[in-house]
Amino acid sequence: MGKVRHSPKEGYFGEFGGRYSPEILHDALAELETTYKKLKKNKHFKKELEYYRKNYIGRPSPLTYAERLTKVWDGARIWLKREDLNHTGAHKINNTIGQVLIAKAMGKTRIIAETGAGQHGVATATVGAMFQMETVVYMGEEDLRRQELNAIRMRMMGAKVVGVSSGTATLKDATSEAMRDWALNVSNTHYIVGSSIGPHPFPTIVRDFQSVIGIESRKQFKKVNGKLPNAVIACVGGGSNSIGMFYGFLRDKKVKLFGVEAGGYSTEPGHHSATIQFGRTGFLHGTKTLVIQDEFGQIVPAHSVSAGLDYPGVGPEHAYFHKSGRVTYVNVDDDGALDAFLEICQIEGIIPALETAHAFRFAKDLAKSMGKKEDILICLSGRGDKDVAEVARLRKGEFS
């Protein structure tokens, strides 16, 4: 296993990362990096961030022992980090609260975002309303169909939701449109990137704001159990909830870390979003990382039943963790995720996001291979209210 580097050198994680962006964005990215470095050391910023985490998001989020799952799966004990209980229903608010404070410090009056499952869009609309900033969210037309509820929530909070019909009309295309908007309106606009992707310093900023998940989890788990979990599992699309969860345990070599990508409906190109398994080193949205691409280096469309995992790349720090061997990456197919979604609903009375359902499906197999005195901690990245209509459509109303 290679040495894990927590602080990137000039925006790199090993060979991955960097800043590959249009010249028009260079000054904005430099301003963002400089401002963030200053704010990280600023006592008032830290105090303000902590205030909103506690009094607006509702942190710390609970650690829940999944007693029924543990009994039914008949293996390792199952624990859940409940990011679904945050305000807005997912981990995304951890990042948007932090970034809107950066935007305010830079004097920006307008914020924009991309979104897939809609949770980052909702979280951005939320902070836009709270800080009275003009808010625009880009969302693929296919995702607007799948996640109509979240689109309505964004509009109710005053955000303008722009449907993107180019390409596959999903997260990659929404991200591209948001980048174009930022390039055209860089003087008054901050782009709140939603995942641990994009040009430096975005992967580091997003990781830092999401690291509260793992830091809290480690402290909570040790307090309850007097030890650390044997395994930590989180779903991976771009990778923000997982990078945040893993961050708390990176130095604990005895804790195995597992990232679960979307296996789609086959291993054929265009049928999955399993970037770690099938991707090659390339460039996407301003960063050097692993990308699903064809023999000519063209981006191959991604697919997942889950809009939040439907992305043909992965955050550069995840690419680094894969290459270093610190994190093991696997994938779960659409049917497996749908089965797990319903199983968690019916066994624990929790409706999980389809993204997290991928992690649950892998956890089931892992738990059965472990001892009953061992522990698995799962990042429940968000609630699945947004997914119930799509699951009902795909399962034709049959939930048994």
UniProtKB/Swiss-Prot annotation:
Enzyme Commission identifier(s): 4.2.1.20
Signal sequence, renumbered to the chain: none
SUPFAM superfamilies: Tryptophan synthase beta subunit-like PLP-dependent enzymes (SSF53686)
Major enzyme class: lyase
InterPro entries: Trp_synth_b_CS, Trp_synth_beta, Trp_synth_beta/beta-like, TrpB-like_PALP, TrpB-like_PALP_sf
GO molecular function, one term: tryptophan synthase activity
Cofactor or coenzyme needed: pyridoxal 5'-phosphate
Function: The beta subunit is responsible for the synthesis of L-tryptophan from indole and L-serine.
HAMAP family assigned to the protein according to its UniProt record, in alphabetical order: Trp_synth_beta
Entry's family note: Belongs to the TrpB family.
Protein name: Tryptophan synthase beta chain
Organism: Leptospira borgpetersenii serovar Hardjo-bovis (strain JB197)
